[in-house]
Amino acid sequence: MKRAYGLEIPETVEEAIDLDRTALLVYDMQVGILRQLRHGGEIIAKVADVLAVAREVGLRTCFLRHMSLPKNLMGVFQMRQALAWQRKASMDDVHPWFLQGSDAHAVVPELAPRETEAVFDKIGMSAFEGTPLDTALRDCGVRVFVIVGVALEIGIEPTVRQGADLGYIPVVVEDACGAGDDDAGKRALASLRYMGDAMFTTVSEITTLLRRAHRNQSGAP
């Protein structure tokens, strides 16, 4: 831990983790997204491991969901995105995949949010853009967020970048973050490492650190 001008500047994930100042972000773990991914089941299992320990230690947890608007309200951004993602040439063939209340929009049942956990819907890629997430985290005194989910190259990378710009310390759980395209996911991680804004960890390490922080905080042996 570095100290300067009254500030504590963590250099490791262990130094960054303070249960009262840390939140877990579960990004876009939705039925309609996971069923498109080759390794969807593996990512669900990894995210479930992190979520279980976060719940065990009482970590604040927020879920993010990608939301489609009805077709007549999609606007230029969502229409262009839908044409690209659905590989369609005509707007007549495009369908809003993630309408609120649809099966595709729901979080996968293995990770079903609890009443004590927030769920924020978004139409953009960054979890902070157009959602109350930043306000909610700041009001709870959160300074660090641990992020898991999908997809690295689409939404997790911009969330980490914007979070860092907002003054948070992002902690990316690499093996609990999936990608739609493996090469693109690797490039996203490499780019985040190059920037130096985020910290990186694994499911094994972060679950160990969360439990250790909980023992230290509670005074348990």
Give the location of each predicted region.
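Active-site loop/turn elements of alpha/beta-hydrolase fold enzymes
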Residues: M29, H66-S68, D175
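Active-site-adjacent betaalpha module
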Residues: M1-A23, D49-V57, Q81, W85-P221
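Conserved protein kinase catalytic core
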Residues: L34, K71-N72, A127, D181
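Von Willebrand factor
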Residues: A54-L73
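Short, contiguous, helix-prone interaction/anchoring segments in small proteins
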Residues: R21-V53, C62
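Glycine-rich loop at the start of a catalytic domain that most often binds anionic cofactors/ligands
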Residues: L73-R80
